[in-house]
């Protein structure tokens, strides 16, 4: 397995600049020195003077905070003063250098403001002496931007935006320098964290050392996550219970899991969908998972994980060196197999449309190399499954590795057998109108794997299905035909018979901030990745 990690030795500005280089073509390059990229975006203009490192022009009426502050001094009070009664659309400029911020910075119901430093490496804010809270915390408001700065050692989340319509994070770092440790309390939770928001644009950012997700968007709608780098977090980039999200041209490496799309029960926005994950480079995500809660379920050694969500398209990614699996697709039954008690345990959220099932997952035109190589696996969640595969032999008679793409299949089997039909009585009218159901899977509900590229150096590229999905096949049930039984099916990726099908392409996400449309339907419309 290759061990070179070229970004580790680079500064943050260099890492983000690399993420803005082009990686085009079907599947891109499997060379780990090749990185995801695309149009830099984020308001870069022809800036001659008075600019940030990213090229953002500072206006004449900008509000300068602690411009003469000494290196290492505490600028908390100056920031709070500048953010008190701030006029709409103000640009607030934090000083160049490294400074202490000894309390959380709260911004409530602001309109159109921009908080900027002088660059992702040029303005560094140390929150290590602040109380147990977020670094920056935006609550409500419209069309807000934070950019060109780094938040270090926040006790909770580095930057949180809750209930904002139009949130733009660009050229921003969220960093915890300490290595991740089980039971450790020195690494914060989320790095960059928009939640319950609309029109979310995350670009050219960097996150390292988060004990949960480095770049996370949850319970939000209309999202673009592009040109970011996530390194050495539990989850690199995560989309959770969110609708209409495009995740492209990102780099995720040395996390426990690179890129994730989840729907979790019990959240105010019950479910998401319409998530496209494309033209990313997710590699060597083998860090031990020390997370708590739902993120602890993510198997260490995972390139991309799709968990209990539907309507996801994964294409043109380079996925390599992830020792448990390249792409893993699992229903919530993997985490909780107590199907008879789902109505009792999850009924309140199932009314609103949350479902343990996964449907309409389209995996195509990705390049895979050197995934699924670990024995034994690094996580208990898939341990029995991975070891079960490793006891078998591939078509050449050699002991096989676990498949690069693994699909659980148990939810589809139970649906096709009619054993989940009673759950239809729980689903509320709005969710039913949006297609949430527990009927047998139709063609549009399928999990499809097609046209992927094998760059493995010394092993077959395999696809696996843990449970067969035909309810009339006795091999999918135990001896008394009363409960599902894992059959651990495996086939070569090319012309596979397990998941070989095609689905309709998903529509691009549309993000609008201050009247400008971002993403593949807007400023990136001519980008090669958006034409794939």
Where are these regions (language model features)?
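Bacterial N-terminal signal peptides that target proteins for export
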Residues: 2-12
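Bacterial Sec-dependent N-terminal signal peptides
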Residues: 2-3, 16-47
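Right-handed parallel beta-helix/beta-solenoid
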Residues: 37-81
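Right-handed parallel beta-helix/beta-spiral solenoid domain characteristic of secreted/periplasmic
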Residues: 59, 64-77, 91, 112-155
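Extracellular beta-strand/beta-solenoid scaffold signature
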Residues: 76-79, 102-103, 127-137, 153-161, ...
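Short, T/G/N/S-enriched strand-turn elements that build extracellular solenoid repeat scaffolds
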Residues: 79-85, 100-109, 115, 125-126, ...
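Right-handed parallel beta-helix
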Residues: 112, 116-121, 142-153, 165-180, ...
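Extracellular beta-rich repeat passengers
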Residues: 161, 171, 249, 264, ...
């Amino acid at each position: 397995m290759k061990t070179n990690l070229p970004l580790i030795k680079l500064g943050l500005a260099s890492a983000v600049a690399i993420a803005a280089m082009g990686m085009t073509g079907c599947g891109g390059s499997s060379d780990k020195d090749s990185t995801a990229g695309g149009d830099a975006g984020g308001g870069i203009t022809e800036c001659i003077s008075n600019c940030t490192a990213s090229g953002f022009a500072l206006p004449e009426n900008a509000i300068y905070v602690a411009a003469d502050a000494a290196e290492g001094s505490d600028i908390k009070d100056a920031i709070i003063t500048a953010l008190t009664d701030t006029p709409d659309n103000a640009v607030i400029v934090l000083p160049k250098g490294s400074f202490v911020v000894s309390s959380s910075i709260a911004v409530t119901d602001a309109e159109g403001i921009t908080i900027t430093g002088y660059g992702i490496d040029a303005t560094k804010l140390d929150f290590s002496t602040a109380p147990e809270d977020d670094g920056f915390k935006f609550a409500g408001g419209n069309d807000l931007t934070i950019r060109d700065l780094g938040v270090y050692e926040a006790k909770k989340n580095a930057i949180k935006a809750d209930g904002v319509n139009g949130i733009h994070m660009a050229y921003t770092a969220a960093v915890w320098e300490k290595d991740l440790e089980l039971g450790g309390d020195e690494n914060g939770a989320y790095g960059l964290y928009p939640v319950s928001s609309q029109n979310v644009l995350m670009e050219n950012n960097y996150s390292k050392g988060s004990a949960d997700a480095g770049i996370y968007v949850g319970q939000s709608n209309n999202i673009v996550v592009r040109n970011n780098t996530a390194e050495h977090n539990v989850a690199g980039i995560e989309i959770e219970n969110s609708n209409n999200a495009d995740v492209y041209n990102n780099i995720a490496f040395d996390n426990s899991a690179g890129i994730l799309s989840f729907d979790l029960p019990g959240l105010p926005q019950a479910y998401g969908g319409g998530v496209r994950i494309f033209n990313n480079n997710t590699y060597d995500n083998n860090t031990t998972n020390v997370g708590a809660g739902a993120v602890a379920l993510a198997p260490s050694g995972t390139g991309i994980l799709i968990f209990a969500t539907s309507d996801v398209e994964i294409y043109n990614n380079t996925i390599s060196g992830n020792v448990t699996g390249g792409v893993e697709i699992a229903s919530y039954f993997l985490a909780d197999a107590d199907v008879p008690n789902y109505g009792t345990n999850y009924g309140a959220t199932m009314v609103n449309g949350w479902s343990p099932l996964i449907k309409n997952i389209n995996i195509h035109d990705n390049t895979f190399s050197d995934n699924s190589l670990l024995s034994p696996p690094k996580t208990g969640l898939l341990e029995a499954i991975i070891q079960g595969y490793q006891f078998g032999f591939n078509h050449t008679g050699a002991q096989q590795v676990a498949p690069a793409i693994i699909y659980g299949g148990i939810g589809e089997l139970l649906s096709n057998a009619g054993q989940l039909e009673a759950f239809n009585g729980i689903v509320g009218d709005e969710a039913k109108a949006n297609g949430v159901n527990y009927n047998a899977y139709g063609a549009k509900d399928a999990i499809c794997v097609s046209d992927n590229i094998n760059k493995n150096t010394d092993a077959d590229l395999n696809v696996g299905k843990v449970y067969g999905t035909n309810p009339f096949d006795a091999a999918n049930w135990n001896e008394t035909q009363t409960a599902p039984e894992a059959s651990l099916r495996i086939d070569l990726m090319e012309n596979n018979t397990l998941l070989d099908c095609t689905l309709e392409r998903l529509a691009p996400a549309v993000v609008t901030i201050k009247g400008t449309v971002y993403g593949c339907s807007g400023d990136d419309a001519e980008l090669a990745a958006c034409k794939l």
